[in-house]
Design a protein with these regions (language model features):
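A short acidic, Gly/Pro-enriched loop at the edge of an enzyme's catalytic core
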Residues: 127-137
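Conserved beta-strand/loop positions that form the S-adenosyl-L-methionine
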Residues: 74-76
Length: 211
């Protein structure tokens, strides 16, 4: 039984984002809607909006990432956005950082079931992963306010890497509160981007910080 069928605008968006790998995305969503709820990774009320609010909202940021980049997803939880990116972009090398064992176990099971050879799951707190992992891009969604997030993500970046933080309406306010820290880390550019306009009913807001 398919718990979360695709229809209408979501179908069009999913086909455009995932292309021939859409069946993998659908299988991932089924994992979210079943074992993801049973094991406490996502709330049952989210099932009707898994595609638009979570999976498409996350996957659409793939257009911001260069081909062949290494990506670390901090506080990956249910794989949002990490697994979405791994499915949409098999050229990327993903490392999912998650401290909780039950979430790590679930992520590993889903990665194995989907046959995602471009994903590694790493059990750790982000701040403890510095030195153990590094990447061209770090992603984060619903982890912490930006002012705290930069401390646990920017040190993971390799050279002139970038942080892609998925944010909401508070993005501009959070950036303003983080300016001193960004100067401390030598950030070259900070911008607030809107991704998925014309494709999603609610486009995704991303704070991009480039070192």
């Amino acid at each position: 039984m398919e718990h979360t069928p695709l229809d209408g605008k979501n179908q069009v968006a999913a086909e455009q984002i995932f292309g021939g790998r859409l069946p993998l995305a659908q299988r991932y969503v089924e994992h979210l809607a079943t074992s993801g709820i049973e094991r406490g990774l996502i709330g049952p009320r989210e099932v009707p909006r898994l595609w638009e609010r979570h999976v498409l909202n996350c996957a659409v940021i793939q257009e911001l990432i260069s081909e062949g980049a290494s990506v670390v997803d901090v506080g990956s939880g249910a794989g949002l956005p990490g697994l979405c990116l791994a499915i949409a972009r098999p050229d990327l090398k993903l490392t999912l950082i998650e401290p909780l064992e039950r979430r790590v176990n679930w992520l590993n099971e889903v990665v194995e079931d989907l046959g995602l050879e471009n994903v590694t799951v790493f059990r750790s707190r982000a701040e403890q992963a510095v030195g153990a992992v590094e990447a061209d891009v770090v992603t984060a969604r619903a982890v912490s306010a930006l002012v705290g997030l930069v401390d646990i993500t920017l040190p993971i970046l390799r050279g002139t890497g970038e942080l892609l933080a998925l944010k909401g309406r508070s993005a501009a306010e959070e950036v303003a509160k983080t300016k001193k820290k960004l100067n401390h880390y030598g950030a070259r550019q900070t911008e607030i981007l809107t991704v998925g306009e014309g494709l999603l009913d609610e486009p995704t807001t991303v704070v991009r910080i480039q070192l």
